[in-house]
Amino acid sequence: MNIHEYQGKEILRKYNVPVPRGIPAFSVDEALKAAEQLGGPVWVVKAQIHAGGRGKGGGVKVAKSMDEVKTYASNILGMQLVTHQTGPEGKKVNRLLIEEGADIKKELYVSLVVDRVSQKIALMASSEGGMDIEEVAAHTPEKIHTLIIEPSTGLTDADADDIARKIGVPDASVAQARQALQGLYKAFYETDASLAEINPLILTGDGKVIALDAKFNFDSNALFRHPEIVAYRDLDEEDANEIEASKFDLAYISLDGNIGCLVNGAGLAMATMDTIKLFGGEPANFLDVGGGATTEKVTEAFKLMLKNPNVQAILVNIFGGIMRCDVIAEGVISASKAVSLNVPLVVRMKGTNEELGRKMLADSGLPIISADTMEEAAQKVVAAAAGK
């Protein structure tokens, strides 16, 4: 689950990480009141969406008068903000963060993620923070320092000080940087985050260390023990189909292609999408019905896929281990009739009750295209989507 910048800063504040004073605003009037409450002479008007790259996309503006606050708030609120993380369709801006300006002397970068290789927590930091951190990672990776943290030990004073010095924090500000780094680590660990990022972490002209931005992503599997995090959820930022899918315990992610995919198991789902692309097709979604799919779940899965007007064909790829092929066949038949299926449907089933499932499909009278291997299924669905 993602949250907005201003919500991330609320979390950082609780963990004693210095952040600028700021007030969220949902209208131009609220933006002006926020600016007045903060006082001048400089404010930053920041679009709040669940995506990075807002500055380059025109979603962050520095205002030096109340008139500029009004102009920028009017322009940004309601705009369709396009960044490298939103896709070409962009995201609509429904809320702003009005923040006091800061005297930026140096921009740094720091983030925490779960490192799957070491099965520990990785802290990454760089002296080159700001809007071009992706370029730094791509072209000068030596400027990014990584520290693997043992969770039972945490981020020690010595390690925090060492990282701070490596990214160019002067001795006079190292203690402040240590406080910020350890606060970020504690926030990451105690909230079950999967990502915590400050970009930039700034040094001001008078030597202060301040988190000028905050990005958090949380492990959805741990949200049951964090109602305070769930309260931050903004459904307007989420795909409506993905929200609907979660109600039926379906793992669904919208994509840009024209071939709907219904698969059991995340690994098989990814392999299926790769195979579709191998034969020149483009998946319209990732959809994992899991190991306990019912007829109802399969029907809802079909409804979700067909809500996408770009879908020209559907591939059902099932490995019947825990999931029986006859149950999937029953669901496919029921779903096809319930949604009045009007696009080609390719079905490939292997495993438990495979022959029974195939017979049920063959006897259904529905125009279902059968396939024996994943490669054959991918080739057939790509051809069907192309009208061949």
Swiss-Prot record:
Boundaries of every ATP-grasp domain copy: 9-244
Gene3D superfamilies with a match to the protein in the record: ATP-grasp fold, A domain, ATP-grasp fold, B domain, Succinyl-CoA synthetase domains
Enzyme Commission number(s) of this protein: 6.2.1.5
UniProt key word Iron-sulfur: no
SUPFAM superfamilies given in the database record: Glutathione synthetase ATP-binding domain-like (SSF56059), Succinyl-CoA synthetase domains (SSF52210)
Binding site for Mg(2+): 199, 213
Similarity comment text for this entry: Belongs to the succinate/malate CoA ligase beta subunit family.
Protein's name in the database: Succinate--CoA ligase [ADP-forming] subunit beta
Species of provenance: Cupriavidus taiwanensis (strain DSM 17343 / BCRC 17206 / CCUG 44338 / CIP 107171 / LMG 19424 / R1) (Ralstonia taiwanensis (strain LMG 19424))
